[in-house]
Amino acid sequence: STVFRQWKAKETHCRFLHGYGISFKVYFEGELDEKNWVWDFGGMKRAKTLIDGKQPKAWMDYMFDHTVIIAEDDPGMGGWETMNKLGVIQLRVIEATGAEKFSEYVYNKLNDFVHEETEGRVRVTKVKFMEHGKNAAYYSE
């Protein structure tokens, strides 16, 4: 689960911190390998390519497991940084927050990772972000 706020949504309750159990669904396309697979899902653990210096699963956990994700232009940034320094929260800062932006963020990170790991044989076609089973957003190029 992760917590975030959309500070620009000033007329809605989404401007406040709120959190969900979240999940992502990633769609791949590419040529089959010698095992007749487009992507070896178990291979994520053996990947040589890293995302921001971390194995893919470790990166996903780092970003989205018991974290507070804040937009880089959030006017309350000083307070978030103080809470992070005090060990009250695990702060993650990205360009913008929300289902749509999380889909885009993960798409870009994973597509770069997959492209490098497979030497261009596979690409991510879209990423679906889900909040608590009711809300979802897709990102694709």
Give residue spans per PLM region:
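Charge-rich, low-complexity N-terminal segments
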Residues: 1-141
